[in-house]
């Protein structure tokens, strides 16, 4: 159970993900929430590492809103040899005014 809320930065890079991985294997992200990233809220990118990024599971988690106009909930960039499993429940949020 982890909550990641990046938020706007006072100094430094404006493109920060709330969570994710650039390399590694056999990782499970379960019951996590990722919001307020200034780039993506959660990203998986093999980052051109020799061993890549594989056997990654994201489940029962929330990918929320980003802080910038270009921010997106998630970004997954892997090669066809790598295994990524994403299991998310889709919930429609209605805001009444």
Short names for language-model regions:
Residues 1-6, 23-39, 49-75, 80-97:
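Right-handed parallel beta-helix
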Residues 6-24:
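Extracellular beta-strand-rich solenoid/capping regions of secreted or surface-exposed proteins
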Residues 10-13, 39, 44-47:
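Short, surface-exposed recognition loops or helix-turn segments adjacent to catalytic cores
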